[in-house]
A protein has these predicted regions:
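N-terminal intrinsically disordered/low-complexity leader segments
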Residues: 1-5, 195-197
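Hydrophobic alpha-helical connector segments
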Residues: 55, 59, 69-95, 150-154, ...
């Protein structure tokens, strides 16, 4: 097995164990045994349980980042891309947290640890928003004076919605499809885009 495949297998096994048993209850030995690798192999890749926890979070964020990149590359109008990016970000974060079971509590308890690992993802997402906003501005779709500022604000607004969205506290009882027109109206008006009635 190649170095990257071995490392990825260790990360996948660790994610499953963290989700099932929690971070505190999972040992490095548990990860080594469940992966069918020796402790020496595990310690070759990761110095500590925290290192492998960071790798699990990074792996989850890479999944999200890849999907956001796919949306940004679509040949659709920039105003549609922004709405799709917003909903994809929120739904993928919720799916990741829910899918990881016991890791969910750890995610919220160690938010500063998660923030440290998230920095690269956050920077990449802001750059993605800049690209889409520039595209919309150049096409005359958005009336934006400062693309960088609008990209920062958009990213941090979405990030601020993550926890309430995960807990289902936003648009309680409404479907995603029912909320999209209202969200689009708010976003488009902020971007200087007229909504056609």
């Amino acid at each position: 097995m190649s170095i990257s495949k071995t490392r990825q297998k260790l990360v996948d096994v660790a994610r499953q164990l963290f989700a099932k048993n929690g971070l505190e209850s999972t040992t490095m030995n548990d990860i080594a045994q469940a992966s069918g690798k020796g402790r020496r192999t595990l310690y070759t890749y990761f110095k500590s349980k925290e290192d492998i926890y960071y790798a699990v979070i990074e792996s989850e964020l890479e999944r999200l980042s890849d999907q956001l990149d796919e949306v940004a590359a679509k040949r659709i109008p920039p105003q549609e891309k922004i709405i799709e990016l917003i909903y994809l970000h929120l739904s993928m974060i919720r799916e990741t947290v829910v899918r990881n079971g016991n890791l969910r509590a750890e995610f919220f308890r160690n938010i500063w640890m998660v923030e440290k690992v998230r920095k690269n993802f956050d920077d990449a997402e802001i750059e993605l928003f800049r690209k889409v906003f520039r595209e919309g501005k150049e096409d005359g779709e958005f009336d934006i004076d400062n693309v960088d500022l609008v990209a920062d604000i958009t990213h941090y607004c979405i990030k601020g919605l993550e926890v309430p969205y995960i807990y289902g506290r936003i648009a309680h009882g409404m479907t995603e499809e029912a909320t999209k027109p209202q969200v689009a109206k708010i976003v488009y008006s902020a971007l200087g885009k007229r909504v056609k009635s």
